[in-house]
Amino acid sequence: MTMPREDAGNVDDQDAGMRLVHLLRAVTVELDRMGERFAAAHALHPTDVRALICLLDSARTGAPATPGTLGTQLGLNSAGTTAVVDRLERLGHVRRERDTRDRRRVLLKVDESAVTLGWSFFGPLIQDIVALMGRYDTTEQATIERFLSDVHKAVTEG
């Protein structure tokens, strides 16, 4: 990673960019801490929480969730992924189902009880963020969405 050079552009723009970087880092730290509190309160490993988030995101987008895709998303090998899925299954948060189109493939489904549990903890924050977005007009919301999408792309491809 290279540091921005003083002569690489307008210093005010660099300062604004760095303020945003620091804010994003602060939000990330707080969200991580919140996830850790959720994990501790519900006898989960932080990786289990990340796995549930990945599986919920897959369900939201309609993408099939398999142990292989989950392992890739979490950066785990097959043994590590199996351990995570086994723990979540034992706790009743996830179930394995055979794919009806390809019986060789196993799909991972999040149980409704896990969704309810997540909403009970994270729901107030989600509602606050959605309400906060009401302060911005549609053009500003589109800019925020584009910015966060670009940041996500930079993080995942960087």
Label the model's feature ranges.
Residues 1-42:
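N-terminal leader segment of winged-helix/HTH proteins
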Residues 86-142:
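Charged, amphipathic alpha-helical coiled-coil/dimerization segments
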Residues 79:
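Key DNA-contact positions within bacterial/archaeal DNA-binding proteins
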Residues 1-10, 139-158:
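C-terminal regulatory/oligomerization modules of transcriptional regulators
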Residues 35-76:
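N-terminal helix-turn-helix DNA-binding core of bacterial DNA-binding proteins
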